[in-house]
Swiss-Prot record:
Role: Required to load the replicative helix DnaB onto single-stranded (ss)DNA, to initiate chromosomal replication. Also loads the DnaB in the replication restart primosome (composed of PriA, PriB, PriC, DnaB and DnaT; DnaG primase associates transiently with this complex). DnaC alters the inter-domain and inter-subunit interactions of DnaB, inducing an open ring conformation that allows ssDNA to access the interior of the DnaB(6):DnaC(6) ring. Has ATPase activity only in the presence of DnaB and ssDNA.
One biological process term in Gene Ontology: replication fork processing
InterPro entries: AAA+_ATPase, DNAC/IstB-like, IstB_ATP-bd, P-loop_NTPase
Catalytic activity field: ATP + H2O = ADP + phosphate + H(+)
Gene, per the UniProt record: dnaC
Family of the protein in this entry: Belongs to the DnaC family.
Cystine residue pairs: none
Induction (free text): Induced by hydroxyurea.
Protein name in UniProt: Replicative helicase loader DnaC
Transmembrane portions of the chain: none
Alphabetical list of Pfam families matching this protein: IstB_IS21
Length: 245
């Protein structure tokens, strides 16, 4: 500190009289250096988080349209949306050690995918493994295992069962084949048995979901403090045009 103070005094003597020094004491200089160090450290942390997210996006199934989805940029225009946002935030905060799953149901374009992606993006930042995948993609991957793809059906089921959070999109859009029902049943059963939650996105109501997936799957989806959030407001897509959407 003495050396810094001596340096400041020498510099002040060398400066022209009309120039005012930014720092008058060694303490002020050190405080500024500490502040700048904290700013650089925060910037570096943000860059590292961004790089980590970029690396994981290719493995998470989060599509480019939803890679920037967050709780902060979720549009709230009614009480129902506020409730959905609050539930999603709470789900993330209580994720560790929680078996609770979630189902987001409602009409297309109401923000189900946005909030599901926001949950996954936040969990990625917290070091969790996540995967968002449609039923159609699951079934396509399953069919590939029959064509000597190098991955067996068992390996694929294990991969789907071992991520910290699996979100299955477009439940109810599929052809309702018996094989699809069996596969989804196996996935949910394995995940619940290993205390790993599952998310589902659907346009169907509870009665339709129960008919489609069966009571056993729906029972698994109710374990713990599981969520069923109904997105029953107007579609965003019907109110936007051009580049806004």
């Amino acid at each position: 500190m003495k050396n810094v103070g001596d340096l400041m005094q020498r510099l002040q003597k060398m400066m022209p009289a009309h120039i005012k020094p930014a720092f008058k004491t060694g303490e002020e200089l050190l405080a500024w250096q500490k502040e700048q160090g904290a700013i650089r450290s925060a910037a570096l942390e943000r860059e590292n988080r961004a790089m980590k997210m970029q690396r994981t996006f290719n493995r998470s199934g989060i599509r480019p349209l939803h890679q920037n989805c967050s709780f902060e940029n979720y549009r709230v225009e009614c009480e129902g949306q506020m409730n959905a946002l609050s539930k999603a935030r709470q789900y993330v905060e209580e994720f560790d050690g929680n078996i609770a799953s979630f189902i987001f149901s409602g009409k297309p374009g109401t923000g189900k995918n946005h909030l599901a992606a926001a949950i996954c993006n936040e969990l990625l930042l917290r070091g969790k493994s996540v995967l968002i995948i449609t039923v159609a993609d699951i079934m396509s991957a399953m069919k590939d295992t029959f064509r000597n793809s190098g991955t067996s059906e068992e390996q694929l089921l294990n991969d789907l069962s071992n991520v910290d959070l699996l979100v299955i999109d477009e439940i109810g859009v599929q052809t309702e084949s018996k094989y699809e029902k069996v596969i989804i049943n196996q996935i949910v059963d394995r995940r619940s048995s290993s205390k790993r939650p599952t998310g589902m996105l659907t346009n169907s109501n509870m009665e339709e979901m129960t008919k489609l997936l069966g009571e056993r799957v729906m029972d698994r989806m109710r374990l713990g403090n599981s969520l069923w959030v109904i997105f029953n407001w107007d579609s965003y897509r019907s109110r936007v045009t051009g580049k806004e959407y």
